[in-house]
C-alpha cells in the first residue's frame, strides 16, 4: 500500500520512511505468525539477564526489521539488537527505537496480545510510530502533527484496508470512564493510582491488555487513562507514544508531569501516565 493514497498532503516529508516501517512491521508480523501458528515448532525460549523471555519469534522479527532499516540514514536501537554505549548514542539526532515482539509473555500464553513496535525518535521525542498486532491483523500508525490512524490488514496479502482516523468517533460514546492497565504487570502502586481515580469516577471500568495495545486503546479513544507504575523500557513505549501524541494524548512522567523522553543514558522509563 502506498501511504500517500490516504492523503498525500499529510505525508510529504516522511511518506517514504513511514511506508518503509509499515511494510517492515507487516513482514515482521508475518515472520512472528509463521512461528505462532505452528506450536509444534521449537520456539527456542530462552531467558535474558532480567529473566524476561526471548523466543525464536523475537529474533526473526528483529532480523526482518533490521534488514528493512539497513539503508536508512538513522541508527537502530532494538530490544534484541546491540545496545551501544551512551557515549556513542548521545550524538544521535534521530534514531529508530524498535521492539520486534512486544509482549513475549502474551505470545507464550497464546492470547494474541503481542505487537511489533517501530518508532522514529528525534531529539528525544517520538515523531513517528507504527504498531502492528499480527494475531489480530490490526495496524496503527501516527506522525507528529499529522494525525494517527488504524486499519485492518488482509491476513493473506497483507494489503492494508481503509484507514480510520484516531480517535475513533464512536469509541467515546455512552461508555464508562475506562482505565487500561497491564495484563501481566499490575503493580500495587498502579492499583493505588486506580483506586484514587475511583473516588472521582464511580463508573470506572478497568480493562486489562498486553503489550503496547494499552497505548493503542488510549489513541483509539476506547480508554481514558493508562497508568504504569512498573518497569518498562524505551522500546516498550516509543511507537505507542508517537501514536498517542498524534491522536492528541500525552505520555507523562508520573512524578514530574513532564513528557517521557528517549535515547536516555538509562533506557528504563520512569513510571508514567498516558491520558
Question: What feature does the model see in each segment?
Answer:
Residues 7-26, 191-200, 207, 213-275:
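Oxyanion/phosphate-interacting regions
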Residues 7, 11-101, 192-195, 256-258:
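N-terminal subdomain of lithium-sensitive/metallo-dependent phosphomonoesterases centered on the IMPase/IPPase/PAP
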Residues 119-215, 264-275:
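Acidic beta-strand-loop-alpha-helix segment within the catalytic core
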Residues 32, 58, 69, 104, ...:
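Residue-level signal for inorganic ion chemistry
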Residues 75, 128, 224-225:
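Short, Asp-centered acidic motifs that coordinate Mg2+ and/or phosphate
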Residues 94-131:
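Glycine-rich active-site/cofactor-binding loop and its immediate structural neighborhood
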Amino acid at each position: 500500500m502506498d501511504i500517500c493514497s490516504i492523503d498525500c498532503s499529510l505525508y510529504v516529508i516522511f511518506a517514504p520512511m513511514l511506508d518503509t516501517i509499515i511494510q517492515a512491521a507487516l513482514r515482521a508480523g508475518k515472520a512472528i505468525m509463521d512461528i505462532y501458528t505452528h506450536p509444534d515448532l521449537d520456539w527456542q525460549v530462552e531467558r535474558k539477564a532480567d529473566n524476561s523471555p526471548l523466543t525464536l519469534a523475537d529474533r526473526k522479527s528483529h532480523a526482518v526489521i533490521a534488514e528493512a532499516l539497513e539503508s536508512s540514514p538513522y541508527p537502530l536501537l532494538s530490544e534484541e539488537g546491540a545496545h551501544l554505549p551512551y557515549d556513542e548514542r548521545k550524538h544521535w539526532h534521530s534514531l529508530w527505537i524498535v521492539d520486534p515482539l512486544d509482549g513475549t509473555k502474551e505470545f507464550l500464553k497464546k492470547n494474541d496480545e503481542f505487537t511489533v513496535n517501530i518508532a522514529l525518535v528525534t531529539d528525544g521525542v517520538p515523531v513517528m510510530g507504527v504498531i502492528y498486532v499480527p494475531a489480530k491483523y490490526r495496524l496503527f500508525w501516527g506522525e507528529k502533527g499529522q494525525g494517527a490512524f488504524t486499519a485492518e490488514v488482509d491476513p493473506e496479502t497483507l494489503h492494508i484496508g481503509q484507514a480510520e482516523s484516531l480517535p475513533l468517533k464512536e469509541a467515546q460514546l455512552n461508555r464508562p470512564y475506562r482505565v487500561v492497565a497491564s495484563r501481566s504487570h499490575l503493580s500495587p502502586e498502579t492499583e493505588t493510582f486506580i483506586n484514587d481515580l475511583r473516588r472521582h469516577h464511580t463508573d470506572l471500568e478497568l480493562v486489562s491488555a498486553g503489550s503496547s495495545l494499552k497505548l493503542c486503546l488510549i489513541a483509539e479513544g476506547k480508554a481514558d487513562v493508562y497508568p504504569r507504575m512498573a518497569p518498562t523500557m524505551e522500546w516498550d513505549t516509543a511507537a505507542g507514544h508517537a501514536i498517542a501524541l498524534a491522536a492528541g494524548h500525552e505520555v507523562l512522567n508520573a512524578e514530574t508531569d513532564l513528557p517521557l523522553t528517549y535515547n536516555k543514558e538509562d533506557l528504563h522509563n520512569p513510571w508514567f501516565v498516558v491520558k
